[in-house]
Structure formats: structure tokens, C-alpha cells
Amino acid sequence: FCDGPTHQSRRWQLVYGVRGSYGFNLTVYGPNRPLHSGHYGNWSPNPIAMLTELIGSMRATDGRILVDGYHEQVKPLSDAELAAIAASPRMDEVLITDLGIGAPETEDRLELAIARPAMNLRGISGGDVGAKARNAIQPSASASIGLRLVPAQTPEYLREVIENHIRKQGYHIIRAEPTTEQRQQHERLARVNWSSSGGYPAYRASFDNPLAMQISTILGDLSDGTLIQTPTMGGSLPLYVVEDVLKTPILILPVANHDNNQHGADENLRRMLETHSDLLTADLWLFCDGPAHQSRRWQLVYGVRGSYGFNLTVYGPNRPLHSGHYGNWSPNPIAMLTELIGSMR
């Protein structure tokens, strides 16, 4: 697969796996309407404070996930995978400067950090801030939480242990807005809604697979021995589906520039465009595009049709006219256009 950002060193890179993905929206509740924080503060539950405490019970400041049993399924990196990481250039200090951060969350290098399970806070909402801030206790607060899975972890298991953790913090889990009865029966309510897609597991090919070894040798020669081999990419792709069908290892060749602001408002594809421009100078162009043959058999296509087009506009009066007063007298552009098209086709 050709996907994802290249290594920050800009050297050729072969990636053997990706993390899985799952996510959920979490909402906790306080009073059934906004309350004045002076009149009711220190008495009424504050959903924003409750939410931050609940998140803090699940995720440490160094990124470690604190949920009991969360790492039970984790398959550790092999000696060969750890050696490949150790052999790759360490870019942490360069990234710290480039990204303008004081320090990373963890003392581990980036490649080790992204090989672990992750709990990412995608967004959080409650009251307003800045000029719109009010001295009020809000009725609810919400967070969107994304999970990155590593090999052997399953979405179903993680859902179970996370919900068990939330219950241990004293919350009753609901799936919709709370009813009056639920508010009266439970001191703490947490609405948990998991992504409708159901998530998907991680995938990682083995370093000692014969096909993987062959490809790494070829790319190593092409890169003059500077190829970086990475056990897993930090991002996610449902590659397990492809592997289940084809029964063959899946490898990833990153093509985008590492500083492409991926998933940001100004994401760009500079490195990908450079890579494709290099491909256009080759003697053989191979494009993966279009629908497969209707028989579902493998197909090699030797050509495509060309394409051209034009916009055609015809004109009538310089302003709209009443069709009763001017019909059958004024030229009608719609009729004229259909006649002209009919003369061509």
C-alpha cells in the first residue's frame, strides 16, 4: 500500500504494519439546567470537572492508559522489530524544535511510543471560553475519544474494559439523553456511544516473511542501503481485511511528506506530488484505478479514452419576460439550446 507520511528524515521507508482504530463519545451530566456558579458552586456537581477527572482516571500525563486490563492482549515487539527501531535515525529533538513543543509526553523515542496502545482526546466541549464565558455550571460536558490499537487487541475487548472502568468510577452508563427517572436513581450518569463502524484491529507483517524480506532487499538496493524499516505506523488502516482475503503479507510504502499537516485544515500532498512526478519520468507507468472486470477476475488494461469538454450557452432577451406576453415572439434560450444540441447528437 502506498499511503501515509514518510519518515521525518526524508529517507526511504518500508512500514510493516498499522495500528487499529476505535472511538467513542463520552458525556457526563450535572443539573438539568445551567446554574449560577456563585449560588450553586461547591454544591452542584460540575460536569466539566467530572469529565476531566474521569478522563484523568483513564489516561496518565505521559500517555499511559490506566484502565485495568487494557494491555492484556498486547503483543510485544519482537527482537528484530526493536533492532529495526534502534537502527533508524532518531528524530525526536528535531521534531521538538520543528513542532514548537517543550517536551514530548514520554521519554521513549517516537517509534516506540506509536507502537503502544493510545488514547487520544479528539475534542472536548462544555461551557464557553473567552469573551463568551459565563459564571455558570453547565448541564453536561462531552469528549470525543479515539483509540489506537496494537496487534492482538480487539475493539470488543477494549469496549468492555473501558466501560468497566467507567462503572468503577461510580457512573451508570446510558446510551441516550438521561430521563428524569435515571437522574433520580443514579448519582453519576455517563453516556457512552461507540463509533458505529465497530472499529477494526491493528495489523503487522513479520520481518522474517520471505516476501517481506524480498521487498526490503529491493528497496534497500534502490535507496543505496539507507532504507528505514519500521514495524508499525502510528496511523490506522483496515489492512487486516486485505490480509484475510489475500492471505499474503501487506507492506506500506509511505508517499506523503511528513510535515503535511495530516488531518489538519491545511493538509497538503507535496511529497506525494514529488513522488508521482518522478514516476512520470519512468519508462513504465502503472496506475491502479477504475472498476475491475465484471467477472471479478484479475485484469490488465492497456489504455484509456481521452477526454475533452466545453460549456455552451445561448442567449435570448436581456431580462426575464412573461411567457404569455412574449411567448412565440421572443427567442427562448432553452428551446434554442435543445435544438442546437439535437443538431449535434
Whereabouts are the PLM-identified features?
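Fold-level recognition of mixed alpha/beta catalytic cores in primary-metabolism enzymes, strongest
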Residues: 1-104, 108-117, 266-345
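An extended, acidic, His-containing surface patch that forms the Zn2+-binding/catalytic region
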Residues: 70-140, 148-164, 169, 174-271
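Active-site helix-to-loop segments that bind/position phosphate- or nucleotide-bearing substrates
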Residues: 145
